[in-house]
Swiss-Prot record:
Family in the record: Belongs to the UPF0324 family.
Disulphides: none
UniProt name for this protein: UPF0324 membrane protein EF_0922
InterPro entries listed in its UniProt record: UPF0324_pro
Keywords: Cell membrane, Membrane, Transmembrane, Transmembrane helix
GO cellular component, one term: plasma membrane
Transmembrane segments: 13-35, 40-62, 93-115, 125-147, 159-181, 213-235, 262-284, 289-306, 318-340
Top-level lineage group: Bacteria
Compartments it resides in: Cell membrane
Pfam families referenced in this protein's UniProt entry, alphabetically: Cons_hypoth698
Membrane topology: Multi-pass membrane protein
Keyword Metal-binding: no
């Protein structure tokens, strides 16, 4: 009994330095967001984490805690997001908006996967890149990774790439949408909400347009989040089928049920309950508060764990992959918005 208690205390002390560091960066980001509202706390947390993690705040003693902050807090954030989403909310963007999101997500997944395979990335990394860009960035990657049995290195590399890509798009899409659509707020919001990776990036980017754009962009983003469960399930089945085919065990594998990660199931249950009974405002606001803090702390941890040296050691392939997927994703969105006459 004493040994288990000592192990627990020792484990806690190993986690605390990195976890507290990520939380302090999140607090500083929240404070700086007061003076830089156009960026937002989520964006600042990533950028500040990247800067500090590659300069002053470095050390192996932080790794375990930042890893917990990055993974576990994102998992809880996914569940809490479900309490702020309803199926009724989706109706506000209309059939036109639903069609845009469904086609945009499908094409993003297909092209991101094909580009990844063309550049000789593994199935896991190509699927993580596809899901992270199509759905909700790090949260989607955290949900998809266990379903396709991706390892920590694959997950970390793609989270880094997706967050870097999202940060670039977050700063450029408000300008691009203004040039293309002018005062057409719905089209600008659709481009931002239908393309950007994380919720924080959507809010930060839409804030650079105006407050109304935030509400509209989040409706498009919510639609993508609602489809997270379906994407995780389909990716898991796709990976199982490929594995089974390579091992000539397809029949045996298809008989086994695909267990979704607990936080994906939790998100779906919360979303259904909120759609049917509508959680009281105090519950939704409390959940949103904690979800926001969890996400910002996790984003700070992701930034702290982003090692530029390691990223550049991967070579030009990663840079080409990110730029290719980002370009295709934005071009597809622009073409779809034109075809659907937004």
């Amino acid at each position: 009994m004493k040994n288990s208690e000592n192990d627990y205390i020792q484990s806690l002390f190993q986690i605390l330095p990195g976890l507290l560091t990520a939380f302090l960066v999140a607090c500083l980001s929240k404070f700086l967001a007061i003076w830089l509202p156009s960026l937002g706390a989520a964006t600042i947390a990533i950028l500040l984490g990247i800067f500090l993690g590659n300069t002053f705040v470095r050390g192996a003693n932080l790794n375990r805690g930042t890893k917990v902050a990055e993974s576990k807090l994102l998992e809880f954030s996914v569940v809490l997001l479900g309490t702020t989403v309803t199926f009724q909310t989706i109706a506000q963007i209309g059939l036109q908006g639903v069609a845009f999101i469904l086609i945009q997500m499908s094409l993003t997944i297909i092209f991101a996967y094909l580009i990844g395979k063309k550049l000789a990335f593994s199935d896991n990394m190509s699927l993580l890149m596809a899901g992270g860009n199509a759905v909700c960035g790090s949260s989607a990657i955290a949900s998809i990774a266990p379903a396709i049995q991706a390892d920590e290195e694959e997950k970390g590399q793609i989270i880094t790439l997706v967050n870097l890509l999202g940060t670039v798009l977050m700063l450029t899409l408000p300008i691009l949408s203004g040039i293309l659509y002018g005062t057409n707020l719905l089209a600008r919001s659709a481009l931002i909400g239908g393309t950007l990776q994380s919720v924080g990036q959507v809010v930060a980017s839409a804030n650079m347009v105006n407050e109304n754009a935030v509400q509209l962009a989040m409706l498009f983003k919510i639609m993508r989040i609602v489809l997270l469960v379906a994407v995780v399930y389909l990716f898991g089945r796709f990976k199982q089928s490929k594995t089974a085919e390579s091992e000539a065990e397809l029949v045996e594998v298809t008989k086994k049920s695909s267990a979704l990660p607990w936080y994906v199931v939790g998100f779906f249950i919360a979303c259904v309950f909120n759609s049917l009974i509508h959680f009281p405002v105090v519950i939704s606001e409390t959940a949103h508060f904690f979800s926001s803090w969890f996400e910002i702390t996790a984003l700070a941890a992701i930034g702290l764990r982003l090692d530029f040296k390691k990223f550049f050691q991967e070579g030009k392939r990663f840079l080409i992959y990110g730029l290719s997927v980002g370009t295709v994703q934005v071009v597809l969105a622009i073409l779809l918005l034109a075809l659907l006459q937004f």
